[in-house]
Structure formats: structure tokens, C-alpha cells
Amino acid sequence: MEHKRLTLFAGHYGSGKTNIAVNYALALAREGKAVCIADLDIVNPYFRTADSAAVLEKAGVELISPQFANTNVDLPALPAEAYKLVTDRSTYAIMDIGGDDRGAYALGRYVPAILEENNYRMVFVANCYRPLTRTPEEAVEVMAEIEAACGLKFTDIINNSNLGSETTAKTVEASASYIEKLSQLADLPVFATSAMESVAEQLPPEYSPILVLQLQEKYFDLPTQKPGNRPLWG
């Protein structure tokens, strides 16, 4: 799997982009690379890169998350440290972008530096089983909205089609025609297929390269909460 210096993951809510971003960061770290990941999603508080802080730290991955992430503050703000991802070219940088056009606005401030370096991959995380992107045509509309909001074009697609814990190899294989059509409509290559290890080992060779996933804990799944945190229903 070829790596760019900067990789950005974006997609509609529920596409699994945060889990993809975290696992990609861990994969790069396993290759011995210096990795920094930033959570630029300041819209959706329920799926956050910061929830994987412990596993990222253990792997040696630097995490930059919105100020007040994992607290009871409703409107987190991007820290100044996030500029490191576009200025420090000695690290492999990963950006977890907001889940729709509103969330993608935060990326706009970094676009001039990204284009100047021109060593990036912006990946659309596709899941054909999610509402609002059940057809390739709907997914292309979401892609266009995100591109218009942030000022950067997608370069690749990753197939993250899944049904959560009910996902099997057949679930992924059934998404093949959808992903092929999406690739044609968007005129973009498929960067990779992602799947949990138990599913990935059952997929035929044509689905390579495969990003093998470990499920990221979500804020409301964590066994313990820091003082000041609130549950999902709070």
C-alpha cells in the first residue's frame, strides 16, 4: 500500500471514517513511521479520534484533537497545533475530517499549504449500507458537497461497507458493484478495502490491499469516563 505524506479521510456520518483514520495511523506506526493524527471533526461529538488516545499513545502516534474534546463543552475548537500536520514534513500526517459539508469547512484553512506541498491523498470513506449514501449517485453528491465546503478534491475511495458486528465476507463482496459504479462516477481509484480481521482473512485476493481494522471504542462505550464527561443521553 503506497503512502502519501498527508492522508485525509472524509465521508458521511456513520461511514466509519474515524475508525479508518485511527487504524491507518496505527498501520503506519507499525511500519516504523513517525505519525501524527488530527481530529478536525468539530461537528459530531459522538465518534471521536480522542476516544482512541490510549491506544494511539501506546503505538507512539501523536494525537491532536479539538480543544475540550471528551468534555461537556458543546462546541470544541481546533488547536493551533493542528497546523503541524501541514508544516512538519518529517511526519506522516492523518486528518479525520468532519462528516458532511459543515464538518469539512474546518479543513479549508489548511488547503493552501496542502496544495503547495502536493503530497496528499484525500480519501472518501464509502459504506453502501448507510442511509443517504445507499446509491453511488447519492455518494457522489455527498463527495461534491464536502469538496465544495473544504476546497479540496477527493483523490481516492476506500470501501468500508459494513453492517457492524453482523458483517461477513459476503457483506463486503456484495458491495463490489456499488464501489465499482462509485469509482466510475467519481473517476477515482479504489485505494483499499477495510474490514475487521475475521472478515479480512476470508476475502479473496481481488480485494487487496486490505486495511485490517480494530474497532475503535466510542465515547459512550468507554468503561470509565473522565470527570466532567457526560453520557450520550445526557
Locations of the language-model features?
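Hydrophobic anchor at the beta1->P-loop junction of P-loop NTPases
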Residues: 9
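Walker A (P-loop) phosphate-binding loop of P-loop NTPases
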Residues: 14
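Conserved lysine of the Walker
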Residues: 17
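Hydrophobic positions on the alpha1 helix immediately C-terminal to the Walker A/P-loop
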Residues: 20, 24
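N-terminal phosphate/diphosphate-binding loop that engages ATP/GTP or pyrophosphate donors
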Residues: 27-74, 78-81
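Switch II (G3) loop of P-loop NTPases
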Residues: 66-71, 90-106
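Conserved catalytic-core segment of NTP-binding enzymes
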Residues: 101-206
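Long hydrophobic alpha-helical segments typical of transmembrane helices together
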Residues: 185-234
